[in-house]
Amino acid sequence: TLKNFSKEPVSKVVFDLQPDLNKCRHEIHESEINTFEADLKSSTRFLIDNDIYTSIEIDGDYESGELVERIYRNPEVSPVAFRPKLKVLSLDIETGERGELLCLGLYSDNYKKSFVSAGKTSKRKFVVSCKDEEEILEKFKEEFLDFDPDVITGWSVIDFDFAYLRDLFEKYKINFSLGRTTEKSRLKIESNFFRSSTLKVSGRLVLDGL
């Protein structure tokens, strides 16, 4: 039997659709009836109901994806004790006095790559010389998707680096899709000091080091 913190019995109401939950919650609050956990996101509610706190096991039919090996639709999920070895990639850019992109660097364990607007070939193997900004973006995107990081990080990587890169991608009409789907990566810059800017990249986590 479910109980609240006062040890009083309570009922659990489940909805298949979020709009139905929102409507019922509003009507209950209008009647001045107390609710518990009604403000939780449906995704959080799903994790709690299935005792999922970290890793999950997925069981069900799947199909091949364009940028991922498997796409599951309505599978069975259950908690599992598993700690994955995540691929973490650090990103940093350097710009010139006129705001032009001079260098874009990537770094990870036993890996580094720098795309530079040098105009000539470098003797250093990790340096990729590009003729202009557009070529830096094209080669960076190709290398980035091939590396396929789980986590992207850097110092002020969202508010500065990715904000700059997003505008540059738009300038050269290159799709700003850096995730594991073809969906465009979504950047939201916050001017409020108490809110953090976010970058949503499908299938990846972006952690700002600032």
Region spans (language model):
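The two-metal-ion catalytic cores of nucleic-acid processing enzymes
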Residues: 1-210
